Amino acid sequence: MRGRLFVMTGASGVGKGTVRAKVLERTRLFYSISMTTRPPRPGEVDGVDYYFVDRPTFEALVREDGFLEYAEYVGHLYGTPRAPVERALSRGEDVLLEIEVQGALQVKRAVPEAVLIFLLPPSLSELKRRLVYRGKDSPEKIQKRLEQAEWEIRNAHLFDYVVVNDVLEEAVADFLAILTAERRRSGRMGEALEMALRRDLALEAELDEILRRRYGGTGH
């Protein structure tokens, strides 16, 4: 059975990376590492947090249709390399993407069965506090991120699920509950299809036997 594609998204500063790390500790998922043209932040490692590349390299991959999705956010390009995701899904592995909102909506258009989970801050004032205390952005960039966040929050209804990241452990538990529910739903669908196929095969065998008895041959 082909794997499921889960997409975590939300405003910058909402805590996607922290929630994602906790989720990956507690369940089996293939985590797809994104590519970006922004410079690494202190402590970030190339090939672990992101693949850090220059703009010409990124744009060359765009021309080769090498991204499942890509978008520009606050002056930098972000994208999900297509090949690793496709390989993992084909192996039957469930895949997790942690990407920007624009990219998540692109994925939903390209892969309608993808499950989009929007991570929401408890309030915009709390989001601003987190961005300020993170200490990574200038006041101008923080304001730009907040304006972007307002638009994203207004469009949260476009996503399959919304998780409020107020208390970290509660947000992680909610995220894991969504994964469990979706996996069970997929399992039930697979079982239902298998049962339907078995019924069809049994009916075909029964009809063949009736025809054989009636006409001394088969129905084929």
Curated annotation (Swiss-Prot):
Ranges for the Guanylate kinase-like domain?
3-180
Q: Which residues bind ATP?
A: 10-17
Q: Name one GO cellular component term.
A: cytosol
Read off the CDD domains from this record.
GMPK (cd00071)
Can you say where in the cell this protein is located?
A: Cytoplasm
Annotated catalysed reactions: GMP + ATP = GDP + ADP
Tell me which EC number(s) this protein carries.
Answer: 2.7.4.8
Its chief place of residence is cytoplasm
Enumerate the UniProt keywords alphabetically. Answer: ATP-binding, Cytoplasm, Kinase, Nucleotide-binding, Transferase
Q: Does the keyword Protein biosynthesis apply?
A: no
Q: Which GO terms describe its molecular function?
A: ATP binding; guanylate kinase activity
Q: Which residues form the signal peptide?
A: none
> Has keyword Cell membrane?
no
Q: Which InterPro entries did the record assign?
A: GK/Ca_channel_bsu, Guanylate_kin-like_dom, Guanylate_kinase, Guanylate_kinase_CS, P-loop_NTPase
Similarity remark: Belongs to the guanylate kinase family.
Functional summary from the UniProt entry: Essential for recycling GMP and indirectly, cGMP.
Q: What is this protein called?
A: Guanylate kinase
The encoding gene is gmk
